[in-house]
Swiss-Prot record:
Keywords: ATP synthesis, Cell inner membrane, Cell membrane, CF(1), Hydrogen ion transport, Ion transport, Membrane, Transport. F-type ATPases have 2 components, F(1) - the catalytic core - and F(0) - the membrane proton channel. F(1) has five subunits: alpha(3), beta(3), gamma(1), delta(1), epsilon(1). F(0) has three main subunits: a(1), b(2) and c(10-14). The alpha and beta chains form an alternating ring which encloses part of the gamma chain. F(1) is attached to F(0) by a central stalk formed by the gamma and epsilon chains, while a peripheral stalk is formed by the delta and b chains. This is ATP synthase subunit delta. It is a peripheral membrane protein. It holds the Pfam family OSCP. It is found in: Cell inner membrane. InterPro entries: ATP_synth_OSCP/delta_N_sf, ATPase_OSCP/dsu.
Length: 175
């Protein structure tokens, strides 16, 4: 996985620089997400590994209908370099670069029960204050947390779940 990320990084940066120059973060993000989704399909991955598949055919297979010429050239470069299987990593890195440029933190909030609108707003406000950035939150429910929530925002994980507190208490008592 780390090798794939290392190989994908320069392509993600190049795509990001191009999108920034074109002022087209959203279209590039959408196109990369589409291409990554298609490339991740096992049947398509097998087809992309076939040396008889031409560059133009690979680009036609992976490019969304509403893409620009620059995006087609980007896919062609990936095809020529045999890097099309890296599209999921490239897409993820592009989105991370975009979020950083737009001063947005993406946070995943996993709670033991469904959060109310007020609770979610309070979490967003606290995260906005902590990171001094806009916050995009996705939520999930995991009953095994027993109570509370786990917030994963970038490099920061805040475990306020009862399951986490019990695990820390057990570790403290064992020492």
């Amino acid at each position: 996985m780390s090798q794939a990320l290392t190989l994908a990084r320069p392509y993600a940066r190049a795509a990001f620089a191009t999108a920034r120059d074109e002022g087209a973060f959203a279209p590039w993000s959408d196109a990369l997400a589409f291409s990554a989704h298609v490339a991740a399909d096992p049947r398509v991955a097998a087809l992309l590994a076939n040396p008889e598949l031409g560059r133009d055919d690979a680009v036609a297979l992976l490019a969304p209908v509403t893409h620009g010429e620059t995006y087609s050239r980007f896919l062609a470069i990936l095809a020529e370099s045999h890097r099309l299987p890296l599209l999921p990593e490239i897409s993820g890195m592009f989105d991370a670069l975009r979020a950083d440029a737009e001063h947005v933190v993406k946070a995943n909030v996993t709670s033991a029960a469904e959060l109310s609108a007020g609770e979610l707003d309070a979490i967003k406000t606290a995260l906005r204050k902590r990171f001094n950035r806009e916050v995009e939150v996705t939520t999930a429910v995991d009953a095994s947390l027993i109570g509370g929530a786990v917030i994963d925002a970038g490099d920061v994980v805040i475990d306020g779940s009862l399951k986490g507190k019990l695990a820390r208490l057990q570790t403290a008592l064992a020492n």
